[in-house]
Each structure stands twice: as C-alpha cells, then as structure tokens.
C-alpha cells in the first residue's frame, strides 16, 4: 500500500482532487478545513482498503493536521483523473484505538 498512499499524496500535492457533495456538507458541519484534509492525507497512512467498494475502489486514511488534530479521510483510489474525497471526520476513542488506526469492536457492530 506504500505505492498507493504515495500516488494519493501526489494527487493532493498537484491539486488534482475534488470533493463529493457529501464531503463538502459534512466538512462544514464537522468544521474540517480543506487545509486539514490535505495535511491529514500528506501526513497519514492508509488504515482500511476497500478495493471492491460498490462505488469504486477507495480507502480510509488516518492522519494528523499540523495542529495534531486527528482526521480520517475516505477517498477514491488515484486511478481517476481527480482524486475524490468522499468524506472526512474526526475519529473518536469510542470507535477507534488510541492512535485512531484500528476500529474497536462493539456489541452493536
């Protein structure tokens, strides 16, 4: 997955990305800035891979902003001309381990 994250980072560095409507709506509600999404991707790592997702191959990236805010970014694979940011959110310790890279199983899931 090293090559995959490098390709994603290159798309971000080259400004070759776009946001889904869902990503725009949720980032406003969650008060996540475009800058923070960029920082999380550029500093992050792929923690979940969805190669067979029904809307196209995608992955979940966990990273920190310059202010040390943890952010998860769900994005498409970089095969398309513009990388699609599907959604972003700030993970919580109720659902993730202390470095926000592994889900915690709950009885509800």
Where are these regions (language model features)?
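Ribonuclease/tRNase effector modules and their secretory precursors
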Residues: 1-109
